[in-house]
């Protein structure tokens, strides 16, 4: 809407000013200083630290994570998440333009994605307290694949775009709560920032590939059809990848409190 009304430069300036507010607001986010509690017992009745009582180092945690099959599967699945979100977020307006839809349809679609993302993320976090988080992740990825198939095979109209955007919005960042929770359950919270950051790094590599590959294939074929099918295949692959992931905390390997 800002671009349509004021052109791209004022719209970008408005977003930049909004981003500048993040810095001052962040100063209010302070953790209360408190004494670290004793190590809590793991599921196997031992303390979540090394057997000699020494907390595991960042290097040792990193080495263990990369030797952990379930952690690697989770990381691979998150690559797919980034691929899909970046492809749709960046290239959906161009795809709709190719179908002769008004630019406002694209902006409305992106707004709907943002709106329904709120509800989807909250729902995923709430459900994660009741059922297995890896099942939630598999469901999210599978539903993305189904939604994209329906979108590709139905006529592209403002209504179909709105329904697709709302559906994808509900599935957008709903992967975040269960993914971070699985990392914490598998490897503890002592080095969660680092280990969760590596999983998110995979997400960002997927984002790059989604944007770059879609542009390259569009230039080569004049269509986004190939990229849609790549995203669909990846969706079901990610759904399958997350099914065998085990969420158990590794025995006697983590200090639960930083």
Report residues per predicted region.
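Helix-loop-helix hairpin linking two adjacent transmembrane segments in secondary transporters
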Residues: 1-35
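MFS 12-TM fold signature
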Residues: 18-22, 143-148, 168, 234-238
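Multi-pass alpha-helical transporter architecture, strongest
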Residues: 22-31, 230-258
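Flexible cytoplasmic inter-helical loops of multi-pass small-molecule transporters
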Residues: 30-60, 251-257
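Extracytoplasmic gate region of multi-pass secondary transporters
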Residues: 63-126
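C-terminal transmembrane helical hairpin of 12-TM major facilitator-type secondary transporters
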Residues: 87, 105, 111-117, 121-182
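A late C-terminal transmembrane helix in Major Facilitator Superfamily
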Residues: 173, 186-221, 231
């Amino acid at each position: 809407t800002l671009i349509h009304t004021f052109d791209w430069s004022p719209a970008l300036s408005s977003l930049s000013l909004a981003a500048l507010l993040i810095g001052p607001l962040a100063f209010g986010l302070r953790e209360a200083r408190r004494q670290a509690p004793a190590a809590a017992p793991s599921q196997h009745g031992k303390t979540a630290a090394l057997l000699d009582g020494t907390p595991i180092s960042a290097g040792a945690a990193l080495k263990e994570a990369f030797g952990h099959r379930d952690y690697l599967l989770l990381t691979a699945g998150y690559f797919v998440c980034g691929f899909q979100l970046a492809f749709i977020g960046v290239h959906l307006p161009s795809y709709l333009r190719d179908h002769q839809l008004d630019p406002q349809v694209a902006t409305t679609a992106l707004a709907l994605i943002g709106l329904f993302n709120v509800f989807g993320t909250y729902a995923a976090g709430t459900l994660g307290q009741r059922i297995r988080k890896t099942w939630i992740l598999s469901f999210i990825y599978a539903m993305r694949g189904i939604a994209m198939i329906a979108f590709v095979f139905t006529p592209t109209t403002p209504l179909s775009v709105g329904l697709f955007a709302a559906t994808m919005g509900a599935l957008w960042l709903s992967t975040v709560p269960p993914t971070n929770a699985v990392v914490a359950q598998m490897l503890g919270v002592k080095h969660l920032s680092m280990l969760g950051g590596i999983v998110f790094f995979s997400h960002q590599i997927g984002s790059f590939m989604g944007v770059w590959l879609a542009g390259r294939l569009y230039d080569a074929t004049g269509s986004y059809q190939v990229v849609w099918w790549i995203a669909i295949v990846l969706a079901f692959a990610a759904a399958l990848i997350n099914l065998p992931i085990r969420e158990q905390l590794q025995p006697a390997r983590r200090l639960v409190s930083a």
